[in-house]
Amino acid sequence: MNNARPLSRGVHHLALNTDDMKMTLDFYVGVLGMPLVHALKVPPGLGTGPGNRGNPPFENLRHYFLDAGGDTLLAFFEMPKGVKPKGDRDCIGNMQHVSFAVSEQRFSQVRKNLEKANLSYLGPINVGCDTWSMYFYDPNGIRLEFSHQGEAEPCVVERWRQTRAEALQELTTLNGELASWAQSSR
């Protein structure tokens, strides 16, 4: 729609919560095949002390990082059991799902791994722009999506980029006047 340069080079990491790190690692490493690349405990003072920089408000939490591909990490904090309720992914401010771009071969392998582990999934579904997806939940109740674009090299942004006219057709359904960024000819 416009030629603005991206703000960043991509996602560094997503940080999610679990109350069972072993169960989480068994799923992400064993079923999905994401390598564990870093394991640490949050240093004292960074959970409840003055040095807290936004970490969960507990001390000595495990904080593990997995290689999600594309130079992106998927991280988990292990929360104390029973301290916090599970969230509702459809609430405002909560994450609805995480989608990973994978090769067609990897897509098929994960599908087989889910079946072997007796885990249900929805798909494959053609979600548009020559992209096929499957949806499933991790053991923490986090909804995941794996998407592939056939044998082609993944080019997610280019494949999903609309023309200005296509985007404006939807944007005009928003209440009120279009924001200046939507009206610009860039």
PLM feature segments, named:
Residues 1-4, 84-88:
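Short beta-strand/turn micro-motifs at beta-sheet edges
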Residues 17-73:
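Core segments of cupin and vicinal oxygen chelate
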Residues 2-7, 38-41:
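A short, N-terminal "cap"/entry segment at the start of jelly-roll beta-barrel domains
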Residues 85-89, 155-158:
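A short, polar/proline- and glycine-enriched secondary-structure boundary/capping micro-motif
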Residues 73-76, 145-146:
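Short glycine-/small-residue motifs
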Residues 1-5, 11-19, 64-70, 86-186, ...:
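Vicinal oxygen chelate
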